[in-house]
Amino acid sequence: MATIHFTKVHGSQNDFFLVDEEENLITEWSDEQRADFAIKLCDRKHSLGGADGILYVTKSSEVGPIGQMRVVNSDGSIASMCGNGLRTVARYLLEKHALTEAKVETMKAILDVKKATSLGFDIPTYQVEISPVKFAAETLPMHVGVEKLFNQVIPELDTELAFSAVSVPNPHLITFVDQSVLDSDKQEKLASYLNSENPYFPDGVNVSFVKRLSDDAIYVRTFERGVGFTNACGTAMSACSLIKKMLDNDTFETPLNVYNDGGRVQVTAKEDAAGEISLQLIGNATFVSKGSVRYENDIVTELTNEATAEQALYQALVKEVKEFLKTTE
């Protein structure tokens, strides 16, 4: 029997249970144990309301980073990266170590994180690096007959939509659409197919439909691999921002406002002298509640759950975003 303490968090209402492995003395858990606990705790029928996944935080395996983030989706699968989750982990670790910036180890990269100026309503806001960025088909992996997919129609997927694909490092398939396509069931059908057994994306893929709002703003809706539709996906919003900049031959260093069903973030693309691209994602890191559960005989039982006042602040931003999005339909 184990008592597990958690912090319920969200980035753009992409919600998670953040679990500190050291404080909970579960650093020796196997991947199977982490997956089973995630499946049980993240069930939307659970008394705690479930979540999109669990963010396991532990010591870094490298010298330098102040911690390591492991992401397990609600279905027990492992996510190589999660931008929205990383913002909340950044806040947790920076506050724990009394720092304003540092590095955090993720599954495939060590990334810069820092506290940022609030995007509004005094909401705790953090900036995280999204990288590495790769376009090669083998990095996704992707089998659609091209080595790099950029703004191209793939008839096997859709006869009209032009797709781009990029890994950041988790895989993303992106297309820009109008409101009528957003209102249709195209995205759900395509994403469901590509996240079941298929010859094109054998490991599945995050599928985003993007609508242009202005020269410096887009709306993104994402069907996440291992989860389904979520309020927002941080790596997807970052990847979509990059594709928009590339399609428009726009300046990389200029921030882009990205709207989603869960709120709003900002993304800036950067390219170094060697041609390597990285992305900076800025958005909320909201702590919704703190609590504990009992995990015994494969059953997760709620013990405590105390809400913070932070969600009310975030809802003010969501209201503003929804009012703005209505004007764009």
UniProtKB/Swiss-Prot annotation:
Domain of life the protein comes from: Bacteria
Amino acids binding substrate: N14, N73, G83, N84, N170, N206, E224, R225, G234, T235
Active site: C82 (proton donor), C233 (proton acceptor)
EC top class, as a word: isomerase
Catalytic activity, EC: 5.1.1.7
Signal peptide: none
One Pfam family in the UniProt entry: DAP_epimerase
Pathways per UniProt: Amino-acid biosynthesis; L-lysine biosynthesis via DAP pathway; DL-2,6-diaminopimelate from LL-2,6-diaminopimelate: step 1/1
Entry-linked PROSITE patterns: DAP_EPIMERASE (PS01326)
Entry keyword annotation includes Cytoplasm: yes
Any single GO BP term: lysine biosynthetic process via diaminopimelate
Chief subcellular location: cytoplasm
Site label Could be important to modulate the pK values of the two catalytic cysteine residues, positions: H172, E224
GO CC terms: cytosol
Keywords for this protein: Amino-acid biosynthesis, Cytoplasm, Isomerase, Lysine biosynthesis
Subunit structure: Homodimer.
PANTHER family: DIAMINOPIMELATE EPIMERASE, DIAMINOPIMELATE EPIMERASE, CHLOROPLASTIC
Protein name as annotated: Diaminopimelate epimerase
Species this chain originates from: Listeria monocytogenes serotype 4a (strain HCC23)
Lineage, top ranks: Bacteria, Bacillati, Bacillota, Bacilli, Bacillales
